[in-house]
Amino acid sequence: MTESSPLAPSTAPATRKLWLAAIKPPMYTVAVVPITVGSAVAYGLTGQWHGDVFTIFLLSAIAIIAWINLSNDVFDSDTGIDVRKAHSVVNLTGNRNLVFLISNFFLLAGVLGLMSMSWRAQDWTVLELIGVAIFLGYTYQGPPFRLGYLGLGELICLITFGPLAIAAAYYSQSQSFSWNLLTPSVFVGISTAIILFCSHFHQVEDDLAAGKKSPIVRLGTKLGSQVLTLSVVSLYLITAIGVLCHQAPWQTLLIIASLPWAVQLIRHVGQYHDQPEQVSNCKFIAVNLHFFSGMLMAAGYGWAGLG
């Protein structure tokens, strides 16, 4: 019996693919979008823009998302829900404790970045807001809470990446708050929650086995696909209502250019909702919708700020 080298041509590409899936590069848009949108809203409404603050905040947010992704892999390995997940970082390394240590390093790096930003401003409001967001992020999978297993992950996403992150990014630029944050906060919160919602369609069997009552486990895939459709449509309705009520500048209607991804997501999940293999990539379509709609909204506020 011959032992194949881990670097053999036949296995190396597969291993690289698994590592890419484990690291989840596309998922870091959930850090980029709220910080960019919140900062753009500050510029659009107040004319304030501090590039150094934006850069530190963005890098800190990316580090915190790395903590969330890695620690969630650790917590999922503890419950056994990821036992068949080849692209789990814990399964790839075989070292749960090392992954947990690295995840906490990223958390520390993110918090230190925010602390440096707050120290320079002599204002700890942003750190306090993100502290609440970090706590909520922990409750998603972390013991003893594990609220994601109760189907509350989407609500946590909506609050954390919507009102909390947008308000923190806005405040970091303007040192103030505004009721006009409502439209972009709800918009980004829902678009982020849609990504998590889509991640459940292909893993109903594993969720059931682990006792995880995800929204798709509770609703079923067909009703879940209909809820997804309403959620996607709501992104455009919320923006239109915000414009009509003078809560958002008309330039935010640029998000209409993201409709191709919205239509693709609705059609894809509508057709394959009960076919795990075919529907499994819907979360990446959701990531595209989240990223491009968010960047378009940020561009709209930037445009408004130019007068």
UniProtKB/Swiss-Prot annotation:
Deletion consequences: Mutants grow photoautotrophically under low light conditions, with doubling times twice that of the wild type, but they are unable to grow under high light conditions. Mutants contain less photosystem I (PSI) than the wild-type cells, and membranes do not contain detectable levels of phylloquinone.
Localization recorded for this chain is:
Cell inner membrane
* Top-level taxon of origin: Bacteria
Coiled-coil region(s): none
Spell out where the chain crosses the membrane: 27-47, 51-71, 98-118, 125-145, 147-167, 177-197, 223-243, 284-304
Q: Which InterPro entries match?
A: DHNA_phytyltransferase_MenA, UbiA_prenyltransferase, UBIAD1
Broad EC category: transferase
What's the Enzyme Commission number for this chain? 2.5.1.130
Q: What are this entry's molecular-function GO terms?
A: prenyltransferase activity
Give the protein's recorded name.
2-carboxy-1,4-naphthoquinone phytyltransferase
Organism, per UniProt? Synechocystis sp. (strain ATCC 27184 / PCC 6803 / Kazusa)
